[in-house]
């Protein structure tokens, strides 16, 4: 029988054995013209159905003739319609048997599709089948439904499919995922047979032994490693060689994430729960959730927003909300080891706000983001205000809540923080990030001063090494809100620490007309203090030439001592060489300071000469002003004053006086 062939014509399937068919079996919309003996020899259920069909067809004529007309009229008042329906079905079967010469059986609850029954028929005829992970599951369920057991016939279909599942499917991660996908069409029977559970167990066990270095790829904007350009690979040491050496292994390992995205949400949820109960790495679980969310939630990443293809099925808002809450509830609570996960979490949060997800879902996302806020970018923080209650362009309250979660996490994990000079690197990164966010939202005309002030002071003092970024945000806010009162201006400027402003920021602030007078005075005071410290340090270094000259021969003496005591050991020699090098560096710095001081003296003398010349010119102008032609010569004197840069009342001080007035303070 192995040489027998099958053909399909429209909605009918024929077995071309040279013998006429003697039975019809209908599955879905397909009618199979087959032979009784091959089917009855392998399937107990088909044997029973065919026997019952033949018995019923042979006795149906006698049953019809025995019926009394009076009884029929009486039954019509109660159950007459049911008898008529049975009679009609029997008449249809008799008509089919009379027309075709063989019975017709319709399998109503057959698991799988007509393709599965076609494979069953081929097995009954002895035709070789090509099994796969996608076809073996419905075929196993069909064999169970048709009672194709080993007791009924040796080497039957149930044992054949079980062997294939054990030897080929359960031993492979990707094959187990494909088989699990096939379980969806026959889920009740596949679950009762244990196929679904065994596939999930295989996935969990195989995933735990996979390469953990590959679990970072789903969160990348491109979605995989295949988007890395050749130039980027050349920048990685050995990257091009590694990509040429093992392309197939990496691609195969990455594809099982994509296979998981083909599962339906209920089965995928079961897989994730099994992974969590199996103590799998949080990176594996998180990568699976990220890849599944990117596949089924459109527009979750700003940089990867593509129009949906015609082949993709539209997902309703309720389904997206359910999926989003499932993804969020299963995310690991601990900090992710994948830095780019933060952008994905912000995308989830934006989608949760748009879909009006549950409050607990949004709170979980905010806490998760807060635990790794130092990895965020300014673009991540710019979440639009989707609520009509917020007048601002961006959701400032959201950022304030996330920042609060970050500070709580930082306080709870003091032992895990590596501090440098008493400052936390994570805290300083967040401080720079918040300053950038403040500068971005400061131009919003609807931003209240209290909200700006509260967000600016929410960070501790050690979060900022310099307050230049905060000053920039304050300046932008005052420029965009000219109607703010003087008291509010002073309050907003109070968020800055003028001692943390750099010299460039102090110079700009001293000339800033938008700052209140109190703030300008503070800036000028600390700017003058910085200049005094700088000048004092330069003078102290320059006023000790005798000390440096008297100690200049020391390097040669130290070198002679080093040559004499070479045999004292390698350690002593190394220390002395280091001391000699430090001494040479110190002498060189002193020489540079002397040169700088000489240059400064030269500039001071030149300024004194210019000042004396200006005094003479001004005195000459004053003498000419006493003549009657003063009114006519005023434009000339004004031009001379402008020529020498005297915008205000001229005040010249001697460089040898104890107090010097900075020219920037006069411009303020």
Swiss-Prot record:
Residues 21-133 form the BTB domain. Pfam families: NPH3 (PF03000). One of its GO terms (biological process) is protein ubiquitination. InterPro entries: BTB/POZ_dom (IPR000210), NPH3/RPT2-like (IPR043454), NPH3_dom (IPR027356), SKP1/BTB/POZ_sf (IPR011333). It comes from the Eukaryota. Residues 73-98 are annotated as: Disordered. Residues 85-98 have a biased composition (Acidic residues). Pathway: Protein modification; protein ubiquitination. PROSITE patterns: BTB, NPH3. Residues 254-530 form the NPH3 domain. Gene3D superfamilies: Potassium Channel Kv1.1, Chain A. Belongs to the NPH3 family. This is BTB/POZ domain-containing protein At5g66560. The lineage of its organism: Eukaryota, Viridiplantae, Streptophyta, Embryophyta, Tracheophyta.
